[in-house]
Amino acid sequence: CSYCIVPYVRGREKSREPKEIIMEIERLVKDGVKEVMLLGQNVNSYGKNLSVPVTFAELLQEVEKIDGLERIRFMTPHPKDLSDDLIDVMSKSKKICNHVHLPVQSGSSRLLKLMNRNYTKEHYLELVDKIRSKMPDVSLTTDIIVGFPGETEEDFEETLDVVRKAKYDSAYTFIYSKRTGTPAAAMENQVPEDVVKNRFNRLLETVNEVSRSISNRYEGTVQQVLVEDVDDHDASYVTGRMTNNILVHFPGSKDLIGTLVNVRLTECRGFYYMGEQENA
């Protein structure tokens, strides 16, 4: 992307051999690990530079076969080449978490072209519809940049439109930061700081408004939670995540860390839930 310094710092993408990945996960599972995260700058590019090419969807299918592994997460897919095969594998999987982080960055097709993102607003929203048609209960999150060089009020309104239509559970929002050596750093029409701050605040308001409108949909249900830690604010509580990556806090001891627990979600508090252990 025209604003990103990562390729200049870390070099071109490299794919690890599938067997190496599988063996590492098997070792982790033997040590008691229940969930793994497969991480890549763009997971859709995985396997293209291997001597025997493998797609990321095929890798996920192999990882799913590992006995004892309960959950598989991954990030980040790029909207420009997220395949139907990957969506199909996710929708049929019993282990891949019900969460897709799909960075949009901007809702303006004009800005997306300047960002060198290689997709349009229309393509992105079609992809969101395709994902939701296969996984109706999916949790969708994103990344958004405000204040990219040349961003107009009309461009920004397009971004707000995508937020409302995609109905994100949450979004990581950023103010554009110039990175020396990137194409974007040399672009004209840098947006004034006061305009950027105003748009950033409006974006946060819209993201929170959309999130609040859908966040309580699990209230009263029983969900499986992987316990991660003792609650930071109350040692008599533990915290963990549902498969859709939403946090849950409920009464429990540190002995529950690393285990999967059925929790009744009693109250939604915005981006997280309070709950009670079911049949404790």
Task: Identify what each model region corresponds to.
Residues 47-68, 115-118, 178-209:
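Radical SAM enzyme [4Fe-4S]-AdoMet core and its adjacent flexible, acidic
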Residues 1-19:
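Canonical Radical SAM [4Fe-4S] cluster-binding loop centered on the CxxxCxxC motif
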Residues 21, 38, 74, 102, ...:
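Conserved, mostly hydrophobic/aromatic
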Residues 186-280:
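Terminal RNA-binding accessory module
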Residues 30-153, 164:
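Conserved SAM/AdoMet-binding glycine-rich loop
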Residues 172-176:
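Glycine-rich phosphate-binding active-site loops on the catalytic face of alpha/beta enzymes
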Residues 13-20, 51-55, 116-123, 151-158, ...:
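Alpha-helix N-cap and loop-to-helix initiation/capping positions
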